[in-house]
């Protein structure tokens, strides 16, 4: 299992940002913090590094998202940490 802590930067003027964040809130893999001034902290829990990367790439390509910044990543017992 992998756990990633990320900071998501949004374009507050883009109405699509709220839709993207609503999609994240509906996804049980994501735990979202407070959205303030276009910045949101979040935790992503996945079953693999591959799934983690796929989720982060998807998010980075969504409308209203300016950037996705990985703060910390840890992947279970396999010894792989960070990227």
Regions found by a protein language model. Give the residues of each.
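Short amphipathic alpha-helices in soluble, non-transmembrane regions
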Residues: 19-27, 54-62
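Short glycine-/aliphatic-rich beta-strand segments at the starts of folded cytosolic domains
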Residues: 1-10
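Short, low-order "capping/linker" segments at domain edges
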Residues: 46-57, 77-83
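A generic structural motif
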Residues: 38-45
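Short acidic amphipathic segments
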Residues: 30, 59-71
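Short beta-strand
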Residues: 32-35
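Generic alpha-helical secondary structure
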Residues: 13-21, 49-52
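Short loop/turn motifs enriched for small/polar and acidic residues
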Residues: 45, 71-73
């Amino acid at each position: 299992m992998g756990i990633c802590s990320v900071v998501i930067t949004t374009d507050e003027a883009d109405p699509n940002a709220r839709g993207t964040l609503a999609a994240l809130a509906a996804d049980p893999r994501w735990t979202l913090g407070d959205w303030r001034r276009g910045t949101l902290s979040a935790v992503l829990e996945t079953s693999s590094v591959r799934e983690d990367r796929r989720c982060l790439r998807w998010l980075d390509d969504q409308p209203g998202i300016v950037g996705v910044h990985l703060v910390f990543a840890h992947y279970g017992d396999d010894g792989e940490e960070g990227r």
